[in-house]
Amino acid sequence: MPELTRFQKFFLTPEKFNKFTRVVGFCGVFALIALSLGIYSYVGQGSIVPKVAALFLIALGGFTLLLSFVINFVALYKRSQLIHLVNRQDRTDLWLQKMANNKQFEQFELFEKGPISADILPTFYPATIYNFELVPKQFKVQYKNGQTLNFAKLSAIKRSTSKNEKVACLVAIIDAVSDQHWFLTKSDFPLINTGFYESLTESNRQNNVLLYTEKDASFNFNQLDKEMIKQVLFNPVNVYANFNVYNNTTHTYLMMSVPITFMDTSLRMEEAVGDLELNITRQAGYDAATLDSFHKVVELLKTKLIGDFNNAETTSATETTVVAEVTEPTTNSKRKPVKAKKAKK
């Protein structure tokens, strides 16, 4: 980002900018009072001030009122332009640096070319409604305990007749947990059988969950851990996260919706440019907490989703329960990091 002048920093500091616009606004109010007084004295039957003074008040009040309006308009336009200029810069490297500083990570790096394609997104995201970025940002995370996580972050614009809405999701890739071809999702996301999913023609419903399989496949809900489905993937408590699981016999993909503020390095309207790096640090703390919940679900996916039903009596509900709650996105200027809740053992 090019070095900003003191004048530009003034416009990008809400506290100073708001004081300036308030002063200009007060000048406009006094100008309006003077203009009203001048008009009333000039055309009214009882003159409060002489006609000459009334004309002066009309001229001065009108000019000051117009000037205050123009100054406020230009100031707001200039501020909007500067915010756009600042947000054109890619600060992914700074975000990566802040993420790598989190104590649970041994290494956090960006893939030049990762293993996840945007095409893997299920077709209940129709292209006529969702405009996803063509190349998702992909990352490799190594934890202090030796575990690794490969994931991608995808953003999209959801179009509708009333408004356009931003959405985002994380996609993790692991070795296949099953030798069958299936897709697990919420019952309100009907799958359109095209692309990766064209052979998934059969659907089975259990409560609020749908399982798509190939025709005549032996795979069904009985092969899945019910506690994992009920308490983790489709727990109604997790109001800020929707999960989907896709298994294609080679890899298993976990998809989780996340707040659009995930990986947000932009300067927000209510933030000061001088606090930008600090706010990115806070955002990285929040994102690390979200990623921690995501990672817990990925690890459970590897070991719990396809249960060992020969020893089902030894598996308790608490052993397959995790609170993977993704907390509400931050919207104020103080992006405070949020701690993820720990999994129950």
Swiss-Prot record:
Instruction: Please classify the protein's predominant subcellular localization into one broad category.
Output: membrane
Where does the sequence pass through the membrane? 23-43, 56-76
Q: Name one GO cellular component term.
A: plasma membrane
The record gives the membrane topology as:
Multi-pass membrane protein
Can you name the source organism?
Answer: Mycoplasma pneumoniae (strain ATCC 29342 / M129 / Subtype 1) (Mycoplasmoides pneumoniae)
Compositional bias of type Basic residues: which residue ranges?
A: 333-345
Q: Does the keyword Membrane apply?
A: yes
Q: Which domain of life is it from?
A: Bacteria
* Segments of this protein annotated with the region Disordered: 326-345
Cellular compartments annotated? Cell membrane
Arranged from A to Z, the UniProt key words for this protein are:
Cell membrane, Membrane, Transmembrane, Transmembrane helix
Q: What is this protein called?
A: Uncharacterized protein MG456 homolog
